[in-house]
């Protein structure tokens, strides 16, 4: 019997895998998406525990503004997700500071002046607003590294962007702040850095000015709440994908002359092309010793040990709360590496996420994987319980809710992520001054028919960054066919 060979086999159903699968299926290609979990979404999914639902990551759905990359991508597929547009992407809080990051620039500036008055606020943030909208209008580039010649030609496609933004690429973020917002208060600086970190995974000193500007500008680009949880976005995409096999763990991959074989405990899946939506630095283990394994293993240095500690809970609450908060702390808590925590709540009317009168909460704070992975069992439990207690107390004190109003709550560590989604490193590749985009892995490889998408390859993390990579991959595939 001749085995069926798909045009594309995709391994991993995160943002990159699901969006690529939907795109290629929409183009008439035969596609099989393999996902080891019983649901799609990876670290952007929604899961259920003891009858309650939680968003896995404390993420916003960004890039939904008119003409923006995420919105245009969904529209190209004819997918209309059920969304609630947010006037404010998130609210930053510390002591008397209460700063909503409005999409409307003037409304945001009014709130900013009442929290962080500065004579150059308007000129600085008008520039951030303008540069963000200009940056995302340039989308005709293609980025490939399959050969040196192709790489050089692809870099030339970025010339329109380079002409406008090259000075920002060559400048560090801290210098940009000193020039355009001199002598700001320590708390203002902390607020800027906290916002930067959730987007680029770097500090202001480590960031380029361009990375800083793009991170600060994302609230202006249209943010939305996904009704039914972030997983509802993947449910909508799944309907557009030719074949989806969930609960299917890939054990090994073999390469043949004109196709690849993904061996799973559910059988073998063959594809003329293979697309990996996995951390690049962990992908080599799926291949035999040889050039492909060596290629992926050279990216192990990109595993920066950065991850997240999570606190999930169901809050019985009649008090109106925002969908997203960033709480600024006096200093990082023990076993964390950030002086800010990000807290998300379900919409009060979203009874798919929580019963009436209740809210589903997802909280995240940066940590190191190594702080959790090698601990003895009792030490691990004690350390985890202590951090859960601290974070819960901060939420209650800052937002004016009571611990007794939490019906349930529990924590998750990098070890938890490794167990359930197969990766402990989260957040993608840091967007730093010393690592501009052209040093990052491309969406193609030196091997015919082997491609990559996701937050450890071009372009970046989050919905806009990963979809930019999917769009880039589509151009590579179009050029090759």
Regions found by a protein language model. Give the residues of each.
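N-terminal glycine-rich phosphate/pyrophosphate-binding loop and immediately adjacent elements
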Residues: 2-140
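A conserved FAD-binding loop/helix module that cradles the flavin
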Residues: 58, 455-478
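General small-molecule cofactor/ligand-binding pocket signal
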Residues: 82-84, 244-247, 407, 451
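Active-site/ligand-binding neighborhood in enzyme catalytic cores
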Residues: 133-243, 247, 423-433
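A glycine-rich dinucleotide-binding beta-alpha-beta segment and adjacent secondary-structure elements
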Residues: 187-199, 401-460
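Short coil-to-beta-strand
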Residues: 205-210, 356-365, 446-448
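Mid-domain catalytic core of redox enzymes
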Residues: 220, 249-356
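C-terminal segments that line or cap access tunnels to active or ligand-binding sites in enzymes
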Residues: 316-415
């Amino acid at each position: 019997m001749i085995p069926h060979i798909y045009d594309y086999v995709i391994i991993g159903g995160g943002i990159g895998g699901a969006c690529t699968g939907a795109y290629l299926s929409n183009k008439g290609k035969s596609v099989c998406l393999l996902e080891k979990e019983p649901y799609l979404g990876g670290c952007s999914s929604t899961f259920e525990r003891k009858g309650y639902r939680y968003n896995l990551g404390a993420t916003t759905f960004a890039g939904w503004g008119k003409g923006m990359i995420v919105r245009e991508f969904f529209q190209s597929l004819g997918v209309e997700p059920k969304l609630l547009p947010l006037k404010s992407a998130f609210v930053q809080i510390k002591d008397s500071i209460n700063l909503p990051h409005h999409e409307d620039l003037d409304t945001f500036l009014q709130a900013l002046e009442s929290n962080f008055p500065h004579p150059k606020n308007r000129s600085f943030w008008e520039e951030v607003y303008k540069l963000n909208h200009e940056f995302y209008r340039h989308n005709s580039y293609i980025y490939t590294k399959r050969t040196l010649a192709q790489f050089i030609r692809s870099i030339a496609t970025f010339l329109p962007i380079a002409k406008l933004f090259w000075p920002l690429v060559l400048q560090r973020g801290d210098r940009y702040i000193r020039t355009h917002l001199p002598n700001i208060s320590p708390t203002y600086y902390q607020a800027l850095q906290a916002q930067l970190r959730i987007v680029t995974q770097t500090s202001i000193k480590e960031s380029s000015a361009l990375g800083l500007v793009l991170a600060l500008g994302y609230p202006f680009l249209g943010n939305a709440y996904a009704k039914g949880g972030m997983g509802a976005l993947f449910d909508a995409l799944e309907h557009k994908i030719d074949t989806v096999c969930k609960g299917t763990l890939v054990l090994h991959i073999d390469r043949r002359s004109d196709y690849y074989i993904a061996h799973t405990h559910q059988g073998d899946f063959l594809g003329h092309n293979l697309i990996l939506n996995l951390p690049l630095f962990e992908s080599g283990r799926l291949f035999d010793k040889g050039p492909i394994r060596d290629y992926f293993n050279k990216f192990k240095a990109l595993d920066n040990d950065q991850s997240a500690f999570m606190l999930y809970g169901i809050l019985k609450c009649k008090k109106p709360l925002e969908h997203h908060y960033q709480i600024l702390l006096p200093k990082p808590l023990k076993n964390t590496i950030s002086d800010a925590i990000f807290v998300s709540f379900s919409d009060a009317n979203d009874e798919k996420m929580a019963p009436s009168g209740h809210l589903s909460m997802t909280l995240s704070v940066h940590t190191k994987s190594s702080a959790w992975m090698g601990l003895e069992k009792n030490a691990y439990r004690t350390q985890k319980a202590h951090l859960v207690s601290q974070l819960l107390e901060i939420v209650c004190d800052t937002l004016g809710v009571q611990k007794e109003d939490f019906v349930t709550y529990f924590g998750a560590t990098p070890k938890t992520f490794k167990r359930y989604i197969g990766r402990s490193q989260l957040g993608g590749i840091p967007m730093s001054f010393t690592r501009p985009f052209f040093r990052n892995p491309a969406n193609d490889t030196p091997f015919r028919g082997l491609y990559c998408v996701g937050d450890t390859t071009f372009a970046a993390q989050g919905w806009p960054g990963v979809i930019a990579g999917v769009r880039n991959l589509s151009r590579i595939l179009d050029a090759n066919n």
